[in-house]
Amino acid sequence: MILDLSDGTVLHELWTVQRLAYAVEAELIGFDGIPPLHESLDELRACDETFLGLYDEEGLAGAVSYRLDGSTVDICRLVVHPRAHRRGIASKLLDALPDGPQVVSTGTRNEPALALYRKRGFVETGTREVGPGVSLTDLAKQ
């Protein structure tokens, strides 16, 4: 379902899940400077991404955001609440994205994310350093 970030409750749920999810990634990659980890509610509300969310009995379990670049789906964020890990939430969210080629970037040391994308047919297209000792891996799927 599309998340309406003009709804304060939805916005706060997303912000909370995002902070929890990126805290896990920060620990995995040894870098706490991930921009969404430090994003304010106002910054999140103002971003130009479309968000899809998946709820379970406890609330928002995960979300994915994207931008369309022509026919290419640029995946901006994929976050899963730590309580919902290993339940297929990320795969369900990726399944809900629009059809077309997809691109995504993730921390090079985030092995769980890389494994998920590889399993779903993404191939690595490059790596770039974004800070001292911190790199992102770019992936694409046709």
What are the functions of these language-model segments?
Residues 1-16:
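A short beta-loop-alpha structural element at the N-terminal edge
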Residues 16-47:
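Conserved GNAT-fold acetyl-CoA-binding loop/helix
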Residues 42-53, 74:
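A short helix-loop-beta-strand connector motif used in the catalytic cores of GNAT acetyltransferases and
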Residues 53, 59-68, 72-79:
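Conserved beta-strand in the GNAT
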Residues 54, 83-96:
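Conserved acetyl-CoA pyrophosphate-binding loop and the N-cap/start of the following alpha-helix
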Residues 76-86, 106-108:
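A short, internal acetyl-CoA/4′-phosphopantetheine-binding micro-motif in the GNAT/acyltransferase core
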Residues 94, 99-112:
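Conserved GNAT acetyl-CoA-binding A-motif
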Residues 103-105, 123-138:
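Conserved catalytic-core motifs of GNAT/GCN5-like acyltransferases
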